[in-house]
Curated annotation (Swiss-Prot):
It comes from Gorilla gorilla gorilla (Western lowland gorilla). Keywords: 2Fe-2S, Disulfide bond, Electron transport, Iron, Iron-sulfur, Membrane, Metal-binding, Mitochondrion, Mitochondrion inner membrane, Respiratory chain, Transit peptide, Translocase, Transmembrane, Transmembrane helix, Transport. GO terms for cellular component: mitochondrial inner membrane; respiratory chain complex III. [2Fe-2S] cluster binds at C217, H219, C236, H239, S241. This is Cytochrome b-c1 complex subunit Rieske, mitochondrial.
Amino acid sequence: MLSVAARSGPFAPVLSATSRGVAGALRPLVQATVPATPEQPVLDLKRPFLSRESLSGQAVRRPLVASVGLNVPASVCYSHTDIKVPDFSEYRRLEVLDSTKSSRESSEARKGFSYLVTGVTTVGVAYAAKNAVTQFVSSMSASADVLALAKIEIKLSDIPEGKNMAFKWRGKPLFVRHRTQKEIEQEAAVELSQLRDPQHDLDRVKKPEWVILIGVCTHLGCVPIANAGDFGGYYCPCHGSHYDASGRIRLGPAPLNLEVPTYEFTSDDMVIVG
């Protein structure tokens, strides 16, 4: 085949391109060698990575646009003329608009104005809070109909001399006693040293002939019986407490005298309790 390709003349390249070789039985005398690949470069581990040469690529190579330091004033880059630098002059006071002047000269006036605004605000808030608290507390107070029942008018001409009448006042029994002249003199002559809860008769009445008491025993809250007991005043049937005609404890376990409510004589024939 090779000889035919060599004799073909101008067709030799075509014939040689389409030819193929057939392996013979003879072994080659020289072994074929494979070309060696180039070796990879070995890094020098002894060379420090953070060196001037290794960091030179990260260094700034252009002019600085801003710098800040202890002795270096801050600078602004005006490379873009369409960017407006923030100006807070509208929010600053007139005394501190000039940056070349010291603010200590106007500090007293500025502090005084701040204190004035704070004080006025505090007073306003306190006044509003006072009104709110007053309305809240008044909403929990008794209504007008309840306050009307808090006072009771008693016509004294309906109570004969030497008698005791009971009324209901604020859910409690109220005793109104029309004393005789003998009872008045008897209670006024009692020595205070004989009393467990010392109190003179004149200190418990506004008019000697009228005694107004709350009919609740000071021991355990029972209702005493009028015109009874060893002293002719009131007697508690629960535990045997004896009161005189002035409502003072004279005998028994009760520790205190009968309570005297607040009352006022509006006329000779009318008294208002409460």
